[in-house]
């Protein structure tokens, strides 16, 4: 048995299918305050149901807006009906305010989470099998084997590595080039390692074939990380959890100690 060669550099060139993600966030400096932070003072009696710039002089016909300024439409009860973001250093006149009031197609600004939308649309496409019949040894020199029932995995010190479970590791594309998603299938079977919740044993899920695209079944995917001589398998479905071993426990998901999340991948040369 020998350690598997480092494949990370070669795989970086395999991501030609990656999708680019472009943020539509406004090009404002991150240290600028949002226009939602504007402070509102009581409106004069003749200012209800009219547009007026905030924090400006009452005698000025044209005002320069600063970082804290925005334009609002206030109803008689003081409720803000409409807001518009303005460019920095933009002049605004009374005519501009009137145009905003008459704009029937003014866009309503709604809170949203680009990150959530981006993650929910994530797809992982199969690239190739990068390891055939490899063995996983943990930091205690225990090898992964099947438990007596055959339904789960466990770790044990072996004198004969032929008794260890052999895995085929398949790589998938990712929108993040810093991560390498993989699946772990028991060689010559249809059983794939599937992550569960913290401290729960990993499952062996039977599939008809290696998935070509994974979108919803992220429990089958693990981000393979390499630090020094050790390998780690972080769950795509539970990003804080790793495949782990522990004395008198089945192979399970854990964030770290007292469980062991450090492995070495041994290549089968028999």
Swiss-Prot record:
Post-translational modification: Acetylated within its nuclear localization sequence, which impacts subcellular localization.
Matching Pfam families: IL1 (PF00340), IL1_propep (PF02394)
Domain of life, source organism: Eukaryota
Region (Nuclear localization signal (NLS)): 82-86
Gene Ontology cellular component terms for the protein in this record: cytosol; extracellular space; nucleus
GO molecular function, one term: interleukin-1 receptor binding
Main location class: nucleus
Subcellular location: Nucleus; Cytoplasm; Secreted
UniProt keywords, alphabetically: Acetylation, Cytokine, Cytoplasm, Glycoprotein, Inflammatory response, Mitogen, Nucleus, Phosphoprotein, Pyrogen, Secreted
Quaternary structure note: Monomer. Interacts with TMED10; the interaction mediates the translocation from the cytoplasm into the ERGIC (endoplasmic reticulum-Golgi intermediate compartment) and thereby secretion. Interacts with IL1R1. Interacts with S100A13; this interaction is the first step in the export of IL1A, followed by direct translocation of this complex across the plasma membrane.
Record remark on domains: The similarity among the IL-1 precursors suggests that the amino ends of these proteins serve some as yet undefined function.
Function, in words: Cytokine constitutively present intracellularly in nearly all resting non-hematopoietic cells that plays an important role in inflammation and bridges the innate and adaptive immune systems. After binding to its receptor IL1R1 together with its accessory protein IL1RAP, forms the high affinity interleukin-1 receptor complex. Signaling involves the recruitment of adapter molecules such as MYD88, IRAK1 or IRAK4. In turn, mediates the activation of NF-kappa-B and the three MAPK pathways p38, p42/p44 and JNK pathways.
Annotated protein name in UniProt: Interleukin-1 alpha
Species whose genome carries this gene: Sus scrofa (Pig)
